[in-house]
Amino acid sequence: MANRVVLDFEKPLFELEAKLEEMRVYLRNSSRDQDSSDQDVLNREIEALEVKVETLRRSIYKNLTRWQKVQLARHAERPFTLDYIYMMTRDFVEMAGDRYFSDDKAIVGGFAILEDIPSGFSQPVMIIGHQKGRDTKSNLYRNFGMAQPEGYRKALRLMKLAEKFNKPVITLIDTPGAFPGIEAEERGQAEAIARNLFEMARLTVPVICVIVGEGASGGAIGLGVGNRILMAENSWYSVISPESCSSILWRSWNYKEQAAEALQPTAEDLLAQGIIDRIIPEPMGGAHTDPEAMAGTLKEMLIEELRILMSKESDVLVRERVEKFSGMGVWDE
C-alpha cells in the first residue's frame, strides 16, 4: 500500500484500509501468544472494520463529483492503450511512422487479432490509440500522450491501410490534448486533425472509438469519428479541460470543480446528450484497481459492436457515421 497512488478524496478510505491491514498483521503475528478469547475479540473488530471499509468505499465511488471523475481518468496507474492491446488482443504488430516526417510515440497502432474463443469470434482489427508514460522518463518519451501532427498522420495512414484490407478500426482515446508547441503548429497540427476528421468520416470499414481516460479537445476528436463511441465510466471528454476552462473564465485554476460541473464532461453527461453510445462499467474504485477485468469488459463490448457493424454494407457505415456527427450539438436558427 506504500506505493499506491492516492487521490485526495480517497485518503479517508486509504487510512481506514491501512488501519485494517495493521490489525490483520498484528493478528497474524500475535496469534500464538494470545488466547482464543482475545483472538475472537480481535477477529470481530476486524470484521466490523471490513464492513466499515466497504461501506465507505461504496459511499465514495458511487457519489463521485465530475471533478473527481476527471481525477480518476488521470490516475497514474490506470491502464493505457498498450495495456489494453496486450490484454484484449493477440499477435499485435505495431506499425511506425507517418511517411512524411517522423514516428510520434504519443500514438501507437497496428494490426491485431481480437478474438473470443468460446463464441468462435476471431477478427483482425486495426487498433490505434494515444499512449502515455508511467514515469517521468516514459512520459517524456511519449510526450505525455500529446500527439504531434505526425502522430495523427500516422493514425490516418494506418486507418487507410485497414480500409484497403477491409479490416475494422478501433481507436482508444486518452490524451490531455494535442501538443500545442510552436513546432507542431509549424508542421500543421490543425490541418492534421482536420484531415483525420474528414477522412475518418469516409472510411468504408467499421470504426469504433473508445474514450478510456482523458478526452481533451481536438487531440481527442482527431481519433474520435466513429460509428460507435464508447466511454469508460470514469473518463472525461470535452472541448477543454476543467483547469483551462477555469483559467479562462475566472483567471485562476482554483475554480476547476465549478468548471467541471459546467462542462458536463462525464460519460453519464455525454450519454444523456447523445454524444456517446455506451458506457463501459469500471471496477469499483476505477479501471486501475482491476485492469484485467476492465479489459475483459471492454473486449466483450467491442465484440458485440463489431458483430453488428460488420453485417452492414460500406455505404451504410459511411452514411450512419456522417448522420451521427451531423446530428450532434444544439443551435438556434
Curated annotation (Swiss-Prot):
Enzyme category, top tier: transferase
Enzyme Commission number: 2.1.3.15
Domain of life: Bacteria
UniProt keywords, alphabetically: ATP-binding, Cytoplasm, Fatty acid biosynthesis, Fatty acid metabolism, Lipid biosynthesis, Lipid metabolism, Nucleotide-binding, Transferase
GO biological process: fatty acid biosynthetic process; malonyl-CoA biosynthetic process
Annotated compartments: Cytoplasm
Pathway(s) of this molecule: Lipid metabolism; malonyl-CoA biosynthesis; malonyl-CoA from acetyl-CoA: step 1/1
GO molecular function: acetyl-CoA carboxylase activity; ATP binding; carboxyl- or carbamoyltransferase activity
Known role: Component of the acetyl coenzyme A carboxylase (ACC) complex. First, biotin carboxylase catalyzes the carboxylation of biotin on its carrier protein (BCCP) and then the CO(2) group is transferred by the carboxyltransferase to acetyl-CoA to form malonyl-CoA.
The protein's name in its UniProt record: Acetyl-coenzyme A carboxylase carboxyl transferase subunit alpha
Source organism (scientific name): Chlorobium phaeobacteroides (strain DSM 266 / SMG 266 / 2430)
